[in-house]
Amino acid sequence: MKRTLTTGAATLLAMLALGVTAVQAKTLVYCSEGSPENFTPALNTTGTTFDAARPVYNQLVEFARGTTTVVPGLAEKWEVSADGKTITFNLRKGVKWHSGVNNFKPTRDFNADDVLFSFNRQWKEDHPYHKISGGKYDYFADMEMPTLLESLEKKDDYTVVMKLKEANAPIMANLSMDFGTIQSAEYADMLLKA
């Protein structure tokens, strides 16, 4: 018995010693059943793209893990008008953007500009990023967002007002889906200038 305890203690000490020598990873390694087409769920409707992008991006609202219950995401709260046609999103403060890709160094946190960028690129034909996919955003269109949206406005840096042409019962669940991923407008602006 004493020998077993001694061996166990030695093993535990060795494991602890190995743990303190951890090295900062330089590359993210992700295992998937296939290669994603890209990391922009707005452009694709495949599981490999969604699976690769989900750990990287968030939506305004999201599904609670393993359910279809809508919970706060990048919007910490929201209010739906009595007629169901206006949704006011209060955005989470202090959310940081990723850096390093194409030497991008964000100068600001997530805000309403990113929400407008992410939806308008799919919705507005005159948006500079709309044509990237040939103007086709199948998921966005399949959720009938182009015909449902009346306007999307920035009230202030942390408030976005979405107006619908008519009330839509599943709108919050729909916004939890992958096409609703929010991306950095600042990063997109940097790419346009490159």
Task: Annotate each PLM feature.
Residues 11-12, 23:
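Cleavable N-terminal signal peptides
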Residues 1-10:
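Bacterial N-terminal signal peptides that target proteins for export
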